[in-house]
Every structure is written in structure tokens, then in C-alpha cells.
């Protein structure tokens, strides 16, 4: 990337900063990502890659045991059009997933999200063709400024403090661009906990930072895509050197929860690969995306050279998805996709919530699973769409429902409390499960859960 023109050494050397304990190794490389997308697209085009913008994929095709292609929808004009695609291999790279749980900042505004509001495309596509999913039962929550959701908390260089000025954690007492304040990484629910206990709010304090340090922080935020936040603060006269910035815990998202893949990015379905935050067994973030995108891309290309095209457009899965989405367009006065999405968020937030303040149980999860089935039944028969845009959103809601189904079933199968998965009927952490992954997947119409050793290769 550095050779291509992504500035990986903006200070002249490789610099790792943030998300680290004082005095311990820093693993996160800080670089200038402002031109990253432009550079990577340029390099991809240079080797012959073709881009089809405004063509979301809404279904995968499987012929025999292999992936054979996909169904895209051309949404470049007001009237959508189906575009079947034959493919020898497929690599999913749709990013993380928002809009599955009620928005913690602004419940009525679903798109106030800490990242790009991606919506479960990769996980939903993989789920429906039988790919195994892993770590779906563990809620991932991020944090950042209150009400205006923006992630990138490690780019803030200050100290988390109580209202009386006392540091919340023991790791930082002054602003530090090298380490930041790692308290919220260690104590994931800190911002929610201090509010629940009445000892909050929690503030990010940069009052002791130098002008040079603040200039660095603002530059780093620009490289991380936080320009809307910076613009808002400047417009409203919010100066972190003078004003404490309240932080909060955001709603659960699927970030490093999803498809179970091999070291080369291949899922349990031959010919189907995945890279990035929709992968469930490799961590998350840019490092995983870069590694699996590179390795998975090479592996997918090598495998494609050994197989023939198959008639993906003739498969039942493609036919059924075309019929379902067409029925939405035939029902322009039908229920709005937002109604279905918000109902899904309510079900997930009430029956499969994130701990530690809220709990799960067999009775809650079974009820949630039943309500989810009822919601899907109603949505498929009542949802309508008036144009390409609303059809795309309706398809996203169906993908989100698939993720909800995977989460409910995985949470039922993990009969213990671990991390933010808190079972009131199994309040302990089972040490015998510490070296195992729980995977779930569709086999026919049934959801099947299985345990596998963490270091065991992905099985088909």
C-alpha cells in the first residue's frame, strides 16, 4: 500500500499508537487513510478489475456443493432490474453490520451509526446458502461521542474522567497520543455502567493537551474518516481543550462476527470466500480485511482456474429471491421497510440484548425466535417498495433478519455466560469451552449448532 501511494508512514517511520496498555507493545499502525479508497480502486483497475456500482447482491447461487454465482439488482435508475451473474468463485466483503439493534443514541434515527451503515449483506448471503457462522452470540459494542455516533475512540488522546475530574480508569492521567486511555477497551461497558450507577457521565478530557498534540489528533481523525464530527465541533464551537466531550456505549453491531473461514478466507461452502468485518473467526478491522482480501483473492482466483461456469441463473434460490423482491415492487402501497426494520430492532434489543446490564435466557430467546419468525412471515407478505432505493432497503432488512436468526440460535446453544453474552439461567463461564468455537448454519430448513476446536480448520 505504501508503494501504491497510501501514506503508511506519515511521520517518516512506521508508527503504532492507541488501544494499548501503558508501557506495553502498541500493535495498531497509524497511517493516513484519507486517499485509501481512491488508491486501491486505481490499483484494482490497473490489473483489469471491473466495478459495478449500484449493483447490490441480494442472493447467491449454489449448484451441487459449490457456489455458482449471484443475483444482483441494478439500482442505478429508479426502476430496478435483476442482473444474474455466473461466477466460478465468490468473495464476500460487505463490511460490518448496523441497524440490527435499536439505536442507542437516537432510537428514531437508524442511520446515526458509528461506521458506514452497512447491513448484513455478506452474513445474510452466506447464511442462506448454508455457510457456517461463528461468534454470532457475542454482542460487539463500540463507543464514542454521545448522540452523534462516530467510532475511532483510540484516536482521542485524552483521559476518561468522572464529572469531578477523577480518572475513571487507572491507565491514564494525562493526554497521550502514543497510548491514549485504554480504559474503555478493558472495561467495555464503562460508559453504560457509570450512567446506570449514577456516577456518570463519563467525559473525554483533552484539556491538558498541547496545541501540537491537538493538531495531531485532528489530523488523525481526518485520516479515520471523522470529518463530519470535526466539522460539527468547529461549527458549534466545541473545543476539546476547553470542553469535556461526553462518551457513550453504542448499540450492538456485527463486527468480527459472521462467516467461519479458513486461513485463505474460504467458508464451509466450496467456492465461497469472505474477507473483512463480516468474518467471525479472525478478529476485525482493516488488518483482517487487508490480509484476507489479499490471501482470499489469490485463493479464489486460483480455484476459479480449475472449475467451469455453471447456470447460476437457473437455480431455485435465484428464482425465489427474484419472485420475492418482485412481489415488493408489485405492492407499492405495502408496509414500509422501516417498519419491518424497527420491529426487528425491538425484538433483538428485548430478547437478545447485550450484557452485562441486560440478560438472555432460554425463555427470552425462544420468545424472540418465535417473534422473529412471525415478523419475517409478515414482512415477506406485506412489505412494499416503490423504487430501486426502497427495494434495496427491503432486501437489507431480510438480510438482517437472517442475522437475527443466527444470533438467537447461537445464543441458545451457548449455555454459559461469557463476555457480553450473559445467560441468567447459566450465570457461570464454563472453562471447558474456552478453546472452542460455536458455529451455526442452515442444513435444509433447520438451524444446526456445532462446537469445534478454535485451531481446527474450517470443515465442510
Task: Mark where each language-model region is.
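FAD/FMN-dependent oxidoreductases across multiple families
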Residues: 229-268, 315
Amino acid at each position: 500500500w505504501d508503494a501504491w501511494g497510501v501514506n503508511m508512514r506519515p511521520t517518516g517511520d512506521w508508527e503504532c499508537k492507541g488501544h494499548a496498555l501503558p508501557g506495553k507493545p502498541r500493535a495498531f499502525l497509524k497511517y493516513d487513510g484519507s486517499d485509501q479508497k481512491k488508491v486501491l480502486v486505481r490499483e484494482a483497475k490497473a490489473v483489469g478489475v471491473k466495478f459495478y456500482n449500484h449493483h447490490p447482491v441480494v442472493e447467491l447461487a449454489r449448484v451441487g456443493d459449490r457456489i455458482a454465482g449471484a443475483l444482483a439488482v441494478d439500482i442505478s435508475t429508479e426502476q430496478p432490474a435483476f442482473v444474474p451473474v455466473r461466477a466460478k468463485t465468490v468473495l464476500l466483503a460487505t463490511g460490518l453490520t448496523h441497524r440490527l439493534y435499536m439505536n442507542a443514541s437516537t432510537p428514531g434515527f437508524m442511520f446515526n451509526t458509528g461506521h458506514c451503515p452497512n447491513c448484513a449483506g455478506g452474513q445474510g448471503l452466506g447464511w442462506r446458502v448454508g455457510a457456517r457462522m461463528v461468534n454470532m452470540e457475542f454482542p460487539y459494542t463500540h463507543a464514542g461521542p454521545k448522540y452523534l455516533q462516530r467510532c475511532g475512540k483510540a484516536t482521542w488522546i485524552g483521559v476518561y474522567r468522572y464529572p469531578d475530574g477523577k480518572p475513571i480508569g487507572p491507565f491514564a492521567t494525562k493526554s497521550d497520543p502514543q497510548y491514549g486511555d485504554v480504559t474503555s477497551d478493558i472495561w467495555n461497558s464503562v460508559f453504560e455502567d457509570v450512567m446506570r450507577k449514577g456516577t456518570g457521565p463519563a467525559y473525554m478530557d483533552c484539556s491538558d493537551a498541547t496545541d501540537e498534540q491537538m493538531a495531531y489528533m485532528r489530523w488523525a481523525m481526518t485520516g479515520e474518516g471523522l470529518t463530519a464530527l470535526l466539522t460539527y465541533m468547529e461549527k458549534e464551537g466545541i473545543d476539546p481543550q476547553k470542553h469535556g466531550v461526553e462518551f457513550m456505549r453504542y448499540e450492538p453491531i456485527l463486527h468480527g462476527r459472521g462467516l467461519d473461514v479458513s486461513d485463505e478466507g474460504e467458508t464451509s461452502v466450496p467456492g465461497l470466500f469472505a474477507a473483512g468485518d463480516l468474518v467471525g473467526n479472525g478478529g476485525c478491522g482493516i488488518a483482517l480485511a487487508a490480509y484476507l482480501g489479499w490471501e482470499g483473492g489469490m485463493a479464489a482466483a486460483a480455484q476459479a482456474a480449475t472449475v467451469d461456469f455453471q447456470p447460476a441463473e437457473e437455480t431455485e434460490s435465484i428464482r425465489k429471491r427474484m419472485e420475492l423482491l418482485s412481489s415488493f415492487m408489485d405492492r407499492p402501497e405495502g408496509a414500509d421497510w422501516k417498519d419491518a426494520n424497527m420491529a426487528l430492532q425491538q425484538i433483538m434489543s428485548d430478547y437478545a440484548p447485550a450484557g452485562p446490564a441486560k440478560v438472555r435466557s432460554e425463555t427470552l430467546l425462544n420468545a424472540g425466535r418465535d417473534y422473529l419468525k412471525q415478523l419475517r412471515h409478515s414482512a415477506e407478505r406485506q412489505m412494499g417498495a416503490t423504487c430501486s432505493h426502497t427495494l434495496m432497503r427491503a432486501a437489507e432488512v431480510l438480510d438482517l433478519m437472517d442475522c437475527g436468526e443466527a444470533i438467537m440460535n447461537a445464543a441458545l446453544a451457548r449455555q454459559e455466560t461469557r463476555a457480553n453474552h450473559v445467560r441468567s439461567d447459566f450465570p457461570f463461564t464454563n472453562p471447558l469451552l474456552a478453546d472452542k468455537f460455536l458455529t451455526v448454519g442452515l442444513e435444509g430448513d433447520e438451524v444446526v449448532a456445532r462446537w469445534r476446536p478454535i485451531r481446527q480448520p474450517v470443515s465442510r
